[in-house]
Amino acid sequence: MVVTKIIIRCLFLLAILVSPLAQADAIDDIVERGTLRVGIAEFVPWAMPAKRGGHVGYDVDIGVKIARDMGVRAEFKVYEWKDIIPALEAGEVDMIAGGIVITPERALRITFTDPVALSGAGMATNTHMTREVENLQQLNDSDIVIATVTNTYSEGVARSIFDKAEIHSHSNKNDAETEILEGRAHAYISSLPAVQFLVANNSDAIDLPLSEPIVGWAEALAVQKGEQELLNFLDAWITAHKADRWLDATREYWFESRDWMQEVKR
């Protein structure tokens, strides 16, 4: 009995000693490696192929800034959206950049930082195919096809609000956008900024029936479960750069201007 108590006490003390070291592993690995591995997916204007190679966008600027503040360089790994959370869980990346929507379901698998920004779901419609549609309720019909991207929050919005419509989920935004542009879908639901840019670039064929989000949401960064030290650093980073308005200025550049369009590969 005495031996058992001694063993239990030793294990308890060992857990106390090891725990801080285990929590610091992610940051230690990043610093020792010299790179912060950032998971991104291609959505306008979060991450887009650049003319000079690599990617540009809001998420890219965030990843680069975080890495510089850590004294390392950013290494971007591009995934289809459905694969980005599994990549984080598998340890292929250290974090997911700022376009991921906070949901309770996702929080069971990954850990979110404090919110980086607020946004919401928007809808683009094919002008010719919806010329007789007068309200959103008319789009909730079995004859209506709505395009989305698999495993995005927007897909859930589409299936929830337009439960009678035929929902076509695509592995990437290019395929989803092509479907509405080619007249094979009546509407496309994605983040409001993404559909706004799609409409701006295709105003002869695509319309924006609503200027406000269908549903609002909060966006954050994400890390693996249990990486408390990295989470603490990122929360502090968000607080600091909200205070100095770097985050506001960066979001204004990517979401409210078009100055960056010359950087994007066509």
What role is predicted for each listed range?
Residues S19-L21:
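N-terminal signal peptide c-region/cleavage motif recognized by signal peptidases
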Residues N126-I144:
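Flexible hinge/capping segments at coil-to-helix
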Residues I66, L88-E89, L139, I180-L181, ...:
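Hydrophobic residues within well-ordered alpha-helices
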Residues V64-K77, D143, R159-S171, R184, ...:
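A local structural motif
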Residues Y153-I167, L208-L210, I238-R266:
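Ligand-binding clefts/hinges and TM-proximal coupling segments of bilobed small-molecule sensing domains
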